[in-house]
């Protein structure tokens, strides 16, 4: 997986490449968490384009399980990009995104600069 580490605010953020499939399973989440640790990054930013569609179907429980893994390991997960089409289809996903963005562990942002702003104000 191609990625780089940026310093956003006082946080190291592992920013995944915007091509290929980066996050499609719980095993992928563990790999990303390990990569974050090896780069001493407190956050992982994953482009929406590299995520499997099943993550946005809450009935699969995949997004919830992945979010729980990141939370358990103390690594923040930022989902970066436009998810409006998914939000239009699911009230439950809209609620999940809203509640996630109120917290400090899982964030949905339109672009990396929005993540930088959230991290600068303490998410």
What are these regions (language model features)?
Residues 2-123:
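Amphipathic, Lys/Arg-enriched alpha-helical "gate/interface" segment within cytosolic domains
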